[in-house]
Amino acid sequence: MTIPTSFEMLKGMHIKDAFLLIAMLYLGYLLCICFYNIYLHPLRHIPGSKLAVMGPYLEFYHEVIRQGQYLWEIEKMHDKYGPIVRVNEREIHIRDSSYYHTIYAAGSRKTNKDAATVGAFDVPNSTAATVDHDQHRARRGYLNPYFSKRSLANLEPTIHERISKLLNRLEQHQNNDDIITLDGIFSALTADVICSRFYGKHFDYLSIPDYHFVVRDGFQGLTKLYHLGRFLPTLVTILKCLPQQIIRLILPNLADLIVMRDEIQANGIAQFTSSQTADSKASALVGALGDKNIPPHERTVARLLDEGTVFLFAGTETTSRTLAVTMFYLLTNPDCLKKLRAELDTLPSTEDYQHSLSTLESLPYLSGVVHEGLRLAFGPITRSARVPMNVDLQYKEYTIPAGTPLSMSTYFVHTDKELYPEPEKFKPERWIQAAEENIPLKKFLTNFSQGSRQCIGISMSFAEMYLTISRVARAYNFELYETTAADLDMTYARIVPYPKEIPGKTEGLGEIRVKIVGKNHSQIEE
């Protein structure tokens, strides 16, 4: 009597039974993985929901199916389990602002970015998507001189010139009795500024009638794909190989990214390949990525396209949204607007209300407005985990093994009642008081992250905030149009926060809409 082999048994099975057997074996495999993650995993001692830690399934449901709502489930976990929780099988989230700078550490500690968070937009050659600590430090070093506070002195006249163009556009809208979105016009401003820094010239997005352009539309569309891209990073890579017409039929949002990359290539490749020198101080593109002292593999077209995509996204939408949110809070808190204008009125009279950045930074109330606007705009609130590679970390009684992804969302830091009493309120005075009492509150403003991977554009963003708010808030009177606090509601965390969709109104973008009702003081010069 012979014993049949497994192959012979499968060969004799009906195809339906074979598929059923394979499905059962796969289910058994998944159950074993879930059992391991819950009871045998090195992080099994960290509190958390068993449903969350068994695998990526709960996170996938809330992030992909519910379009970015896992952050609120994490909030519930913290309420139930405490300040440290496992949010999936491999990542720990901590809700304790005092531990923020341990996670997002500065200095030489080797801290990688979590590889699971960088694949969404398929920009692997960008500095922001660089996982390895040492490679990131090298790539950032190539760009640092072009985004330092000192280098902004050369960019300041360009920012002022673009703000003057913005003020002229506001006058046109006033004359036409238009309703405009502050998000739109501020996006055009910030896109022109970042292009000036990256290419050495801007493309006058402020002249576009409705302020819809590829950078802005691309960012808004692609945030809807962000979480799906995290779970299926090769999806974007594969789809990008298809003809653009087909991509637009399947995923219009991805087509916007392709158009934007084509625009970067058209605007930058010729300049990049023809120069290949470090002589240009105006363009980070030519000056940094064209420097012959940089290794050749870091001076490629792929690097240009990926770096350009991230720069335009990050340098446009986060700052423009912060400007719009700050103006919303000034308009809904008229006493704050009155105090700000009174402080600005103490400055010497100048054409178009132009003052140097150094002068504006010395004004305590304006500084409070800028920082409070940043706090309540939040910036990116999705988790951006860091991975300490060579050392175990200790949080209270819990040892966290080296190689474990750790995160803390900006949302929890900016709403920490111990740091910010009445965190839902717009109170510029809290920053003045903190400065007078030598409280390092600015350490806990985390829109730009902290540590060795802090946003390289932080100084430029602050410059745009100071220069723009000081002139726009002083020059014109605005009325909000069909815009309430509900438009700032945070329902979906798709990189940045988005409110619930309101059909026929904001389409889930939460844009700040206004009507210009007059000039505040003297006529603005053309």
Curated annotation (Swiss-Prot):
Main location: membrane
Record carries keyword Oxidoreductase: yes
Pathway in which the depicted protein is active: Mycotoxin biosynthesis
GO CC annotation, single: membrane
Membrane-spanning segments: 18-38
Annotated keywords: Glycoprotein, Heme, Iron, Membrane, Metal-binding, Monooxygenase, Oxidoreductase, Transmembrane, Transmembrane helix
Enzyme superclass (EC): oxidoreductase
Cofactor: heme
Superkingdom assignment: Eukaryota
InterPro entries recorded: Cyt_P450, Cyt_P450_CS, Cyt_P450_E_grp-I, Cyt_P450_sf, Cytochrome_P450_monoxygenase
Free-text function comment from the UniProt entry: Cytochrome P450 monooxygenase; part of the satratoxin SC2 cluster involved in the biosynthesis of satratoxins, trichothecene mycotoxins that are associated with human food poisonings. Satratoxins are suggested to be made by products of multiple gene clusters (SC1, SC2 and SC3) that encode 21 proteins in all, including polyketide synthases, acetyltransferases, and other enzymes expected to modify the trichothecene skeleton. SC1 encodes 10 proteins, SAT1 to SAT10.
PANTHER family in the cross-refs: CYTOCHROME P450, N-ACETYLTRYPTOPHAN 6-HYDROXYLASE IVOC-RELATED
More about this protein: Trichothecenes are sesquiterpenoid toxins that act by inhibiting protein biosynthesis.
Protein family membership: Belongs to the cytochrome P450 family.
The name this protein goes by in its record: Cytochrome P450 monooxygenase SAT11
Lineage: Eukaryota, Fungi, Dikarya, Ascomycota, Pezizomycotina
GN (gene name): SAT11
